[in-house]
Design a protein with these regions (language model features):
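Active-site rim/loop-helix segments in enzyme catalytic domains that contact anionic ligands
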Residues: 1-106, 133-134, 138-142, 226, ...
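Metal-dependent de-N-acetylase/amidase catalytic core
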Residues: 1-8, 89-242
Length: 242
């Protein structure tokens, strides 16, 4: 049986966990929940420096991810062994089964991943979100619907567009479609420390350069989600089933 408070995060690259759900992971881990992560790649191509790309960068980013997860309290990290920027080209059923295998081990009560827009429309994000959704339903059927019980997609509410001034780089969700908002104000600094672990990434450096401005706006105190299962418009006060 699943733990009543266990959370599995399923993402594509090192740093997705810190940007997307770092506060939620830290908050729940500190409260005693078991938080696990499945990461499809090691981010081997996340650089403009050809001398760094490949296994060397993958090793660097794996270390960054493990340090970030230690800060957040993520108890277990599983790398799925896919190549950065090629996940969308991989055999889909193989990806689904790789994620399903982690779900069977972790036995989570709730799963968080990317929605259809991948937040940034990155093909790896979209592929991982689709596969995680398929794996969620596959494992539920195989396990007699005992677990996992809830599926959430990371979402950026439309109201934050004016704060982040990201143009078309990020995909936003109408505020009324948000079904869960986790208050991370108590662990916001923990989230920022985790993001800072990803030193090799320009996105992390840029985010931290604007962090004080965004903190002052009050728009960084919540992480938001759309509940993909069970469907419905009910608002959740927690990601865990009652």
């Amino acid at each position: 049986m699943p733990s009543p408070r266990s959370l599995l995060l399923v993402f594509a690259h090192p740093d997705d966990e810190s940007f997307g759900v770092g506060g939620t992971a830290a908050l729940y881990a500190a409260a005693g929940a078991r938080v696990s992560l499945a990461c499809a790649t090691k981010g081997e191509r996340g650089t403009t420096d050809p001398a760094l790309a490949g296994q060397k960068l993958g090793a660097i980013r794996e270390g960054e991810l493990r340090r970030a997860c230690a800060i957040l309290g993520v108890a277990d990290v599983s790398f799925l062994g896919y190549m950065d920027a090629d996940v969308d080209k991989a055999d889909f059923d193989g990806l689904v089964e790789a994620i399903a295998a982690v779900m069977r081990r972790a036995r989570p009560s709730a799963v968080v991943t990317f929605g259809p827009d991948g937040v940034t429309r990155h093909p790896d994000h979209v592929a991982v979100g689709r596969a995680a959704t398929a794996a969620f339903h596959r494992v539920r059927r195989q396990e007699g619907y005992r677990y996992p019980r809830r599926l959430y997609y990371v979402a950026l509410p439309e109201s934050r567009r004016k704060v982040f001034r990201s143009g078309d780089a990020l995909m936003y969700t109408p505020d009324e479609q948000i079904t869960a908002a986790v208050d991370i104000s108590r662990v916001l600094d923990v989230k920022l420390k985790a993001i800072a672990c990803h030193k090799s990434q320009e996105d992390a450096r840029s985010f931290l350069a604007h962090a004080d401005e965004w903190k002052a706006s009050g728009e960084m105190t919540q992480e938001c989600f759309v509940r993909a299962w069970p469907r419905g418009k009910r608002k959740d006060s927690t990601l865990f089933p009652g």
